[in-house]
Amino acid sequence: MVHVNPIVKSFEYGQHTVTLETGVIARQADAAVLASMGDTTVLVTVVGKKFEEPGRDFFPLTVNYQEKTYAAGKIPGGFFKREGRPSESETLIARLIDRPIRPLFPNGFKNEVQVIITVVSVDPEINPDVISMIGTSAALAISGLPFNGPLGVARVGYTDGEYVLNPNVSQLVDSDLDLIVAGTQGAVLMVESEAAALPEEVMLGGVVYGHDQQQVVISAINELKAEASKPAWDWTAPVQDADLVAKIKDLAEAEMAAAYQIEVKQDRYTQVGVVKSAAKEALLAENPEADLREIDGLLGSLEKQVVRSRIIAGNPRIDGREPDMVRGLNVMAGVLPRTHGSALFTRGETQALVTCTLGTERDAQKVDSIMGEYTNRFMLHYNFPPYSVGETGFVGSPKRREIGHGKLAWRGINAVMPSAEEFPYSVRVVSEITESNGSSSMASVCGTSLALMDAGVPIKTSVAGIAMGLVKEGDDFVVLSDILGDEDHLGDMDFKVAGTRDGITALQMDIKIEGINKEIMQIALQQAYGARVHILNVMDQAIGEHRDDISDHAPRITTLKINPEKIRDVIGKGGATIRALTEETGTTIELEDDGTVKIASANGDATKEAIRRIEEITAEVEVGTIYNGKVVRIVDFGAFVTILPGKDGLVHISQIAEERVANVSDYLQVGQEVKVKVMEVDRQGRVRLSMKEAAPKAEAAPAE
């Protein structure tokens, strides 16, 4: 019998108990942790390659997050009945885990590391994202890899003016905030949130609250590490060649500084490439055996130093702006003739062409996940083609980054979207990034707000987004508004804020260094507010409120109510009636259990015809009313006449004419149209009709 020795740590976290266990499962991995929060359990494994591949100039960290349907007691759909490619939710959670752990690996570490998180049990009330992040932090902490953790994680809600630690799924429905914050003992590293237009101070308070509360997570992981950690890897950061650093500085510093005063991105990149090539040629001429990878790395470090030192010294930014300035804006709405709504939003060298398409409830996205089934009426898709940065590349299914940016923009807009009762349409927005030089996701937020208004979607108010950056050297720091791509790459923080004039709807923060304190975040939020209001003012000049009507090319949804008992009549046997209705009128018809009927069509006449026919089908037969009917069957004792769709009545032979009728066929033929009067509807729903009573009465003869 194999002897196993589990090491377990448990602690209370909000209203849930968190358990971390190692030593039983997946013992051949460098580290494996079974992490549980309530009944939601994930298995996290970490494996790192012991040797670095020659020639590699990046850190190959891979995070794979996978939700197994057996965790929820389900069998996968589809022909093969097994899990397939990652869903959007799995991709987003993988990114959520990756972002805070990546900066905790030391510079120069380039060994391949793979983290696999497998959801093996799920409580529909407890989302696996936070416990997956906690489990990943614990597994990395005990793996022996050079990881500067552990990392703490907390979800924060905000209900009735109070912060809530680790709210469950039901509690989040009534919460004005859904915020996840991750950080080390002394610093916040990542924030991801969605909010109902909350003030800056409430958002900042949520970040601080979450960071304070997650210290219990860090303590528990440290205890686990003390008992279960593998031996630390014998890895040391590569030592820089001081002579080579000095030579590169002499060769390229002045030229690099000059290149970074070129404001046009493509021209600047070309000149930076020229400077680097010249430096490499000079160094290789001096020493043909020089390590090109090392030279490239040192040139990159010099590039970073040149840009950062200028900003810290108070010099103008790369494109000549002051720290709090927003690039020039160009905003247009209604730029495409046949789309339901469109906008072109340009900020400096970043541009988004955004379209809005309206559809019926049938067009909504139906999602079946391990957390349950739900429907998305509002979809936002972000595309980043290679031409947007002047490159060639693969065009196909969306990458992780595109999915993540689309979701961030969705969070920024979702708080102002109308309810289904206010606007019974499904809405799909697509943001095509046509130019990119920093903060394309926030350009998507601005463009989406404009396109929705152009489409006539009654959003509550305009929404704008802005990306903030940071350069910090020692105690000196500069917060930058509307960062360029270079400032994002070479800076210490990417801080994206979307919101209205009243508050923040989405906040995403990724920090690459330790030491970001409350003061810096406060300054960034205040600066972001000023930039956001400036952008909103420009947007409102293009279109300040939603159009009064939707596009002529959009389907118009007309709603009517019928008796719920009549739904089966509208559907017909095997769906024949509703199928004929939709095909013959060219409309889309949706029925709800409460008797609500939604008819969608871009053609008003088609809608009217569909309404008329549905009203006919669902109309009640009224005693005493005269109908234009059609003979459908003749029998010896009379004729059956259709007076409404699906409703026949009997004209008895005695009710066909005033005179005595011997043979019904002498008076009536199948298909003949006749006027009939409803005489009676019995308890069984049988209708008695009369042609005699429907005929005009002869005028009384005058008295003699």
Swiss-Prot record:
Residues 624-692 form the S1 motif domain. PROSITE patterns: KH_TYPE_1 (PS50084), S1 (PS50126). Keywords: Cytoplasm, Magnesium, Metal-binding, Nucleotidyltransferase, RNA-binding, Transferase. It comes from the Bacteria. It catalyses: RNA(n+1) + phosphate = RNA(n) + a ribonucleoside 5'-diphosphate. Its cofactor is Mg(2+). It is found in: Cytoplasm. Mg(2+) binds at residues 488, 494. Its EC number is 2.7.7.8. One of its GO terms (biological process) is RNA processing. Gene3D superfamilies: GHMP Kinase, N-terminal domain, K Homology domain, type 1, Nucleic acid-binding proteins. One of its GO terms (molecular function) is RNA binding. It is an enzyme of class 2 (transferase). Residues 555-614 form the KH domain. GO terms for cellular component: cytosol. Signal peptide: none annotated. PANTHER family: POLYRIBONUCLEOTIDE NUCLEOTIDYLTRANSFERASE, POLYRIBONUCLEOTIDE NUCLEOTIDYLTRANSFERASE 1, MITOCHONDRIAL. Belongs to the polyribonucleotide nucleotidyltransferase family. Involved in mRNA degradation. Catalyzes the phosphorolysis of single-stranded polyribonucleotides processively in the 3'- to 5'-direction. Component of the RNA degradosome, which is a multiprotein complex involved in RNA processing and mRNA degradation. This is Polyribonucleotide nucleotidyltransferase. The lineage of its organism: Bacteria, Pseudomonadati, Pseudomonadota, Gammaproteobacteria, Alteromonadales. The gene is pnp.
